[in-house]
Amino acid sequence: MSVQTSPSKQVTSGIQNLNMDSPAKKLDFGATDKENKPFDEDLAKLEAEIDAEHNANKKAAEAKKMAPTLKPEEANEPLLTENPQRFVLFPIKYHEIWQMYKKAEASFWTAEEIDLSKDLHDWNNRLNDDEKFFISHILAFFAASDGIVNENLVERFSGEVQIPEARCFYGFQIMMENIHSETYSLLIDTYIKEPSQRTYLFNAIDTIPCIRKKADWALRWITDKSSTFAQRLVAFAAVEGIFFSGAFASIFWLKKRGLMPGLTFSNELISRDEGLHTDFACLLFSHLNNRPSKQLIQEIIVDAVRIEQEFLTEALPCALLGMNADLMKQYIEFVADRLLVALGNEKIYRSTNPFDFMENISLGGKTNFFEKRVGDYQKAGVMNSTKKADADAEVAKNENGGDFTFDEDF
């Protein structure tokens, strides 16, 4: 009796007889045996690559402990050498620098707060052509200068200084310089109605030689690759402490005469801010270990004095406002002496303040003008967080180079 094969067995037998070889090329997994490699080996290889890249970056960072523009002698400057904590603000380590930032923050104001409604009447009816010429050119100088100060802060100082407390101040200073520039531009826009004259003033660095000369002096320090941070710090203290001083005084001269209330009020706010910026430069200078020689500091200041005196007595004579040129020279020397003392030098001019109307004007804002907020212009509560013991205040005072700060009354 024959055994009958079931249908299922027939199918199974047929499958076994099929030729499973394909004419196509077979995939060869055996060559690399990748599917059989333990996962840990791949992970170890990846970790090794990451470690190698990290070590390479670490070596590169070690080779750049200083910013490219810093000098070998600045390698031990805590303010300038690489600070791994620079991305985090707290805990505060430089309390006097932090207090300076909070003081600047409390003094915030905007261009919209300046009332220019009465200025146009004075401009059109109470000023002569010489006075208009002088004021318009002073405003043109200021409008350009604030941009130059910001150029230095953005391109050099903010990147070079490695401590977050100082970077906070510089960040706020940049904002305030923008507000100053906006204010001066707004003043020009308000007083000068002729479009071509406006363009001439807005482009003062290119169109007005005496302003270009002052701008070139400041710009040279920004681009100077051979000077140290300390030298440039002194130079820009001179820009804000000396280059602006005579112009501020000339506008306060208008206040004494009861002219241009909007201009003179903005001048008071801006002069206070610039005094604080100069104070801050002197404070940072006191934290440097390697400072320029007293002779070099004196040379920078004397050079700035010469340029400022020439600017306000020859190129754009203050006599146009009815001010005495010799007294203006003396006033610039008086301001320069105070800056020299703040930087740890001795006075060289020993000039007294020749302008009685400046006696009650403070670059720190301690005024008695109750009708405006300039005397106690502070945002509520901002300064409360900076209250320290008298000992801390004394330390900050000493580190400013003595008992002088630019917020003292003239």
UniProtKB/Swiss-Prot annotation:
Cofactor info, note text: Binds 2 iron ions per subunit.
Residues of the active site: Y184
Keywords: Deoxyribonucleotide synthesis, Iron, Metal-binding, Oxidoreductase
One GO term of the biological process aspect: deoxyribonucleotide biosynthetic process
Keyword Ribosomal protein part of the UniProt annotation: no
UniProt biased composition (Basic and acidic residues): 23-43, 55-65
E.C. number: 1.17.4.1
MF terms in GO: metal ion binding; ribonucleoside-diphosphate reductase activity, thioredoxin disulfide as acceptor
Binding sites annotated in the UniProt record for Fe cation 2: E177, E240, E274, H277
Residues annotated for Fe cation 1 binding in this entry: D146, E177, H180
Segments for region (Disordered): 1-43, 55-78
Entry cofactors: Fe cation
Keyword Kinase: no
Reaction(s) catalysed (UniProt annotation): a 2'-deoxyribonucleoside 5'-diphosphate + [thioredoxin]-disulfide + H2O = a ribonucleoside 5'-diphosphate + [thioredoxin]-dithiol
Role, per record: Provides the precursors necessary for DNA synthesis. Catalyzes the biosynthesis of deoxyribonucleotides from the corresponding ribonucleotides.
Name of the protein described by the UniProt record: Ribonucleoside-diphosphate reductase small chain
Gene source species: Neurospora crassa (strain ATCC 24698 / 74-OR23-1A / CBS 708.71 / DSM 1257 / FGSC 987)
